[in-house]
Amino acid sequence: MKCPFCGDPNTQVADTRENEGGEVVRRRRRCPKCDKRFTTYERIDLKMPHIVKRNGNRSEFEHDKLAGSMKLALRKRPVTLEALDAAVDRIEAKLLALGEQEVPSEKVGELVMRELKKLDKVAYIRFASVYRNFADVDEFAEVIREVKARPKRNRPAEPPEPTSENDLFRS
């Protein structure tokens, strides 16, 4: 690998370590010419499928766009950034597991709604109202009835207090 300091192509690996999950390899390198050290990271580069929009247009999958739309739905809700990141990771893993080169945007939307429903019911309703393009209050009421009809699992009567400063946009 080429030295970022002097450009010499003959660098040497001084140390190699894997992260805990074995997903990333960290290498400490040394340049024999300028004697400077630097770190490189090696990770698997998986190709996310392209997204086919409702109008037929195709676009590349964008992690930041997915996370941003979920973050918007979760605005001022007691959900941590870690929980959001984990949900985005699960969606990406499901998309990769499909093994398809192209995935309809509807599939992505359904995966997002499924994850938001697990994270926060209000965020789920917010996202669903935009995603499903609710035309009137009756459609909101129907989704609220659907959410209320589902059994609650060990849910406290009051929303939990934020446990860290990573609670999204809590004010």
UniProtKB/Swiss-Prot annotation:
Binds 1 zinc ion. GO terms for biological process: negative regulation of DNA-templated transcription. InterPro entries: ATP-cone_dom, NrdR-like_N, RNR_NrdR-like. A zinc finger (unnamed) spans 3-34. Residues 148-171 are annotated as: Disordered. The lineage of its organism: Bacteria, Pseudomonadati, Pseudomonadota, Betaproteobacteria, Rhodocyclales. Belongs to the NrdR family. Residues 49-139 form the ATP-cone domain. HAMAP family: NrdR. The keyword GTP-binding does not apply. One of its GO terms (molecular function) is ATP binding. The keyword Lipoprotein does not apply. This is Transcriptional repressor NrdR. Disulfide bonds: none annotated. It comes from the Bacteria. Negatively regulates transcription of bacterial ribonucleotide reductase nrd genes and operons by binding to NrdR-boxes. Its cofactor is Zn(2+). Keywords: ATP-binding, DNA-binding, Metal-binding, Nucleotide-binding, Repressor, Transcription, Transcription regulation, Zinc, Zinc-finger. Pfam families: ATP-cone (PF03477), Zn_ribbon_NrdR (PF22811).
